Amino acid sequence: GIMAGYNTLSKEQLNEELVKLKEEYAKILESDISLDMSRGKPGEDQLNLSMGMMNVLDGNSDYKTTVGFDCRNYGLLDGIPEAKQMMADIMEVSPENVIVFGNASLNIMYDTVSRSFTHGVLGETPWCKLDKVKWLCPVPGYDRHFSITEFFGVEMINVPMNEDGPDMDMVEKLVSEDEAIKGIWCVPKYANPTGVAYSDEVVRRFAALKPAAKDFRIFWDNAYAIHHLY
């Protein structure tokens, strides 16, 4: 075929072939097809084998999302749209800014720290290649947070907790002066173990931080965001 001889064609012939291929590509785009190129996913006939369990209580089981995704199969990377929308409504953010993982937030935080060590954050140097990595730890705080940074050998810096949240004078000073400080643990509402809720002023000061490190991150573990509703 002609593909095997591209290196023998003249410039004019190559241009003609390019025009032809673009026309074929345009026709494919116009056909409005949706192809799932992922591998290892069960077919619909296999998924239907479980319908007896799906329908045992309700014969009208609805397993499709609003965009037609079959929830009986492997999930979407960022979560099904309905779950993203629900969490977006609760957290008052756009669903495009929501990723629905599994139900273990500590795993997400651990994986995020781990990836920062092995691959870096948004193109910055992987933390494993740095001489020193430091972390701000409001105290008293959640011991499971501290165990993550301890596991990676991070130098943890205690920040006193006030009645309205962490000592922000100290936080602002430390992060602005030391680029080795890469993050801070936060439980902004009903902090573990004191039950302190960060004030609006503290939250605004967090949002306005000017860290020396481009890859500084606030780990905002808002686990109890809606508990007051119950």
Description of each model-found segment:
Residues 69-214, 225-229:
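Conserved core of the PLP fold type I
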Residues 44, 229-230:
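Short, function-defining helix-loop hinge/capping sites that tune catalysis or transport
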Residues 222:
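Walker B catalytic acidic pair
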Residues 218-219:
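Residue-level marker for buried hydrophobic side chains located in beta-strands
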